[in-house]
Regions:
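Extracytoplasmic "Venus flytrap"
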Residues: 42-62, 85-91, 114, 181-189, ...
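Hydrophobic alpha-helical segments within soluble ligand-binding/sensing domains
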Residues: 94, 153-176, 217-220, 243-244, ...
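Extracellular/periplasmic periplasmic-binding protein-like sensory domains
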Residues: 248-319, 389-393
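Segments of small-molecule ligand-sensing domains
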Residues: 305-315, 326-386
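C-terminal segment of N-terminal export signals and the immediately downstream linker at the start
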Residues: 6, 27-45
Length: 395
């Protein structure tokens, strides 16, 4: 009896010791696994302030793609965690958000809200060495892998956007007269000089360049100058909406027959529709399909199933940013490489003929810091939609 009790007790002790030993072995490993588990997307997102119309869409786009990936089991068994902070579209707040998020999480990829933030945080990204960043900026300056090795643009840079429009113009009307109208801001001035040179190369004639003060309301003097130059095409840049409708309405009243064009931040459907009847036929460059496009795009169908109401082009941009972030992470993990900034960027640059599920209408290859692809769309005010006016144009 005693012998039996002792052996039972010994067995229990041994089992306990074995369990404790196993726990000692597995516990640190599970902690390690836990530590390596999440792929973290940080975000400086302008949910309030002047850029909130875009920030809300960007945030939802990132969230939705993260949900799709996590619902499918994550990436190589790891869950994706998205940690955004509102910045109000202020650089100092954005920098503070970056510091807070990166101090509390092991961030792998980061979405920034502006050109100002991208430039300010760049030395910190280089020092950190473990983060790949993209964001809401398409600034030409950022399209420089030497100067900005840990960043990329989710689409063409502003100069490439002009390049796509100019290529379309040269095909539609060889030798056309073109006007550039832009805001007196870093955003506005960005593509102007290079694009004038590009226009010449394409045999186009830039007949006038008009710079307006940011937020200027009275453009009557500038419209007279524009009318005298009599362009076939007028490209606006450095604005969201105002003063574009004022230019178009007054120009038409004065007998101008120019076609009117814009770049990405003017081209959301909801923005263009605010131009009213005079905005009919307004054209511009868009690197993504619109929410309501009818051409085959499996990822767009998925988005429409998740969100039956219209989603902005900013939403699609955020969604594609998350897709490229996580594709880069997946390629690092597939190659058994640590997710450093350099490895994530090299993985991004290995993307060749990549299908975004139709969100960009052609397969994409990312050689440097941008994706120089886009399509010209045109406003159909009767249908209240943007419709394709060109094929997909690659530079």
């Amino acid at each position: 009896m005693d012998q039996q009790r002792i052996s039972t007790r010994r067995r229990n002790l041994m089992l306990g010791a074995a369990a404790a030993g196993a726990a000692a072995l597995t516990h640190p490993l599970s902690v390690l696994a836990q530590g390596a588990e999440d792929i973290v997307i940080g975000g400086s997102i302008p949910m309030t302030g002047v850029f909130a119309f875009a920030g809300v869409g960007i945030n939802a786009g990132i969230q939705d793609y993260v949900k799709i990936v996590n619902d499918a089991g994550g990436i190589k068994g790891r869950k994706v965690k998205y940690v955004p902070e509102d910045t109000g579209y202020k650089v100092d707040v954005s920098v503070a958000a970056f510091k807070k998020i990166t101090s509390q999480n092991k961030v792998n990829v980061y979405y920034g809200d502006s050109t100002g933030f991208a430039k300010t945080i760049n030395p910190e990204l280089d020092r950190n060495g473990n983060i790949l960043m993209a964001g809401a900026s398409f600034a030409t300056e950022l399209n420089n892998p030497q100067k900005y090795p840990n960043q990329f643009l989710v689409g063409p840079d502003y100069t490439e956007m002009f390049g796509i429009l100019l290529k379309h113009i040269a095909k539609e009307k060889p030798g056309a007269k073109v006007a550039f109208v832009y805001s007196d801001s870093e955003f506005g001035r960005d593509p102007i000089d290079e694009s004038e040179a590009e226009a010449k190369k394409l045999g186009l004639n830039v007949v006038v360049k008009i710079m307006t003060p940011p937020g200027s309301v009275d453009v009557s003097g500038e419209v007279i100058k524009l009318r005298r130059a009599a362009p076939d095409y007028t490209i606006f840049h450095g604005y969201i909406l105002a003063p574009i409708p004022e230019f178009i309405t007054q120009g038409k009243q004065q007998g101008m027959t120019s076609k009117w064009m814009g770049t990405f931040w003017t081209m959301d459907s909801s923005t263009v529709m605010k131009m009213g009847p005079d905005g009919d036929g307004f054209m511009g460059v868009m690197p993504f399909r619109y929410y309501y496009d009818t051409e085959k795009a499996p990822m767009l169908e998925k988005i429409r199933a998740m969100r039956p109401e219209y989603q902005s082009t900013a939403y699609i941009q955020g969604f594609v940013a998350a897709m490229l972030f996580l594709e880069s992470a997946k390629r690092c993990l597939d190659a058994n490489k640590p997710m450093t900034g350099a490895n994530l960027k090299a993985a991004l640059n290995s993307i060749k003929d990549f299908d975004t599920g139709g969100l960009i209408g052609v397969p994409i290859t990312i050689r440097g810091n941008s994706i120089p692809v886009g399509r010209v769309y045109k406003a159909d005010m009767k249908a209240q939609k943007m419709v394709a006016a060109s094929d997909w144009i690659k530079l």
